[in-house]
């Protein structure tokens, strides 16, 4: 039976977002939500017919909130809003981000506080399920009042306007609708505002980054465990009784992950057998990786709330009361997404330092730059440079966006979140750090193959090594390879969910204890 996810505004999970955004799983509006949506819409219709003054329904927007709009102009008001607010810049957001945006907006609207018609929500749902993906530029949102510019781009194809992607083609909005067999709509009172006023874009991008960060945290433990085996690392820093007396959850989880990955390894040692202590990048993995785990677990808890929240304005209450408030403001997610970027950046930083230890012959006791006949061959020399470049770029990107604000809309919107910038930066940091971790895994596998002794790997690291070696070969001589091809293969391997799934079938990995 084909899987379909019900949207009720209450129970959407991060895993559901991934399934719909990346795996194309279909979704539908849960029957339980229909009554609330219809009741909310009736209140808006009554507001228009009674000529009541309500922001965004019978008034202008932003600093024009005191301009009254006649009932006969309320429909034109909404279309004008979409046409003028679609003013983004930059490259288009990727397909998975666009699908996540559409999904999260639908899930917010079905809670029944936005006064939008059920048929309008169903139209956005139809685009999502049929794979019509609006062209949404990545830049142009202040994260308050919501993600106005990018969400307006999302709405344009619903009206037969704008641009959209359909089955690999970049088309006009109307062409995309025609090819998908979808009729365009006209917006009714308040509907344009209901569709674009909210934190949906920053939440969608941040949600995808959060999910990927959770996977990266596990991969970083794997990379660190492989590096530890290269160096015949001391295992006592991962003993549980060390961490129970400082019971930070991420620290405990990291230590357990490392123990599980290294179970049965013959490439480790005990303190005083050959040395007393390992360097921080190996010995302190529970404390370093664990801190990022705790940070990202916190961010996930915020994402779980936001993807099931109403971030519209004004809010149409069940009793007919209308509240003009600030739920569109992105600050509650801007700060966590800045935090997310910092946490991921640290994973890239420490991984790059372990790459340096692997390629440095004085530290690894292996051939310089992990290649036979160094001098004639340069091996992983510039690979470490590239990782250092990414790590340093991350340090710049990790500067928080949420500490900045520029007043807008004639100073009516005088303090904004920059949350969408925070989310986009976090995703860029994620991509950089994932490249570094992939390189560490590649370098560690190369180093293990160069070790004079060939001892059994750990229960988890052996699975990872074997899978990795099916796609990325040992580098014998420079003349046989173009190393960027191998680096790209390494990234492709670890980004494939099946790689981590196979390791987790062998050993348990988690981010919280």
Curated annotation (Swiss-Prot):
Gene Ontology biological-process entries: L-histidine catabolic process to glutamate and formamide; L-histidine catabolic process to glutamate and formate
The keyword Cytoplasm appears for this protein: yes
PROSITE patterns attached to this UniProt entry: PAL_HISTIDASE
Domain of life: Bacteria
EC number: 4.3.1.3
Coiled-coil spans in chain: none
Keyword Lyase: yes
Swiss-Prot/TrEMBL keywords: Cytoplasm, Histidine metabolism, Lyase
Crosslink (5-imidazolinone (Ala-Gly)) position: 144-146
GO MF annotations in UniProt: histidine ammonia-lyase activity
Similarity section: Belongs to the PAL/histidase family.
Listed name of the protein: Histidine ammonia-lyase
UniProt source species: Streptococcus pyogenes serotype M5 (strain Manfredo)
Taxonomic placement: Bacteria, Bacillati, Bacillota, Bacilli, Lactobacillales
């Amino acid at each position: 039976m084909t899987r379909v996810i019900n949207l009720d505004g209450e129970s959407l999970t991060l895993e559901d977002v991934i399934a719909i955004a990346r795996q194309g799983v279909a979704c539908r509006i849960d029957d339980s939500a229909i009554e609330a949506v219809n009741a909310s819409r009736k209140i808006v219709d009554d507001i228009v017919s009674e000529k009541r003054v309500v922001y965004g329904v019978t008034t202008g927007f932003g600093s024009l909130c005191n301009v009254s709009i006649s009932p006969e102009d309320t429909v034109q008001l909404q279309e004008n809003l979409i046409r003028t607010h679609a003013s983004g810049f930059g490259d288009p957001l990727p397909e998975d981000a666009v699908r996540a945006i559409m999904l999260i907006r639908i899930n917010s609207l079905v809670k029944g506080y936005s006064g939008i018609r059920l048929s309008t929500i169903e139209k956005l749902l139809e685009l999502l399920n049929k794979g019509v993906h609006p062209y949404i530029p990545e830049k142009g949102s202040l994260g308050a009042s919501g993600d106005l510019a990018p969400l307006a781009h999302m709405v344009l194809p619903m009206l037969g306007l704008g641009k959209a992607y359909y089955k690999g083609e970049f088309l006009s909005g109307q062409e995309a609708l025609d090819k998908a067999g979808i009729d365009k709509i006209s917006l009714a009172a308040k509907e344009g505002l209901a569709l674009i006023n909210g934190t949906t874009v920053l939440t969608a991008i941040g949600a995808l980054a959060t999910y990927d960060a959770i996977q990266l945290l596990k991969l970083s433990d794997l990379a660190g465990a492989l590096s530890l085996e290269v160096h015949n690392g001391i295992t006592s820093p991962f003993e549980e009784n060390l961490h129970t007396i400082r019971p930070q959850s991420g620290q405990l989880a990291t230590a357990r992950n490392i123990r599980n990955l290294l179970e049965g390894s013959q490439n480790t040692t005990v303190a005083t057998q050959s040395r007393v202590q390992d360097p921080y990048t190996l010995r302190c993995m529970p404390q370093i990786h664990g801190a990022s785990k705790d940070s990202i677990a916190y961010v996930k808890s915020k994402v779980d709330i936001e993807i099931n929240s109403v971030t519209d304005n004004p809010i149409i209450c069940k009793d007919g009361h209308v509240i003009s408030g600030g739920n569109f403001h992105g600050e509650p997610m801007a700060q966590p997404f800045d935090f997310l970027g910092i946490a991921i950046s640290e994973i890239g930083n420490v991984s790059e330092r372990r790459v340096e230890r692997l390629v440095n012959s004085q530290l690894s006791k292996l051939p310089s730059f992990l290649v036979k006949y160094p001098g004639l061959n340069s091996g992983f020399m510039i690979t470490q440079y590239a990782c250092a470049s990414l790590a340093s770029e991350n340090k710049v990107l990790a500067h928080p966006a949420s500490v900045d604000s520029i007043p807008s809309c004639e100073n009516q919107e005088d303090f904004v979140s920059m949350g969408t910038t925070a989310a986009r930066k976090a995703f860029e940091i994620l991509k950089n750090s994932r490249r570094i971790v992939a390189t560490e895994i590649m370098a560690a596998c190369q180093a293990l193959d160069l070790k004079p002794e060939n001892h059994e790997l750990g229960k988890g690291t052996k699975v990872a090594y074997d899978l990795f070696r099916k796609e990325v070969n040992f580098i014998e001589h420079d003349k046989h390879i173009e190393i960027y091809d191998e680096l790209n293969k390494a990234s492709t391997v670890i980004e494939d969910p099946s790689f981590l799934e196979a390791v987790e079938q062998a050993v348990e990995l988690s981010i919280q204890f």
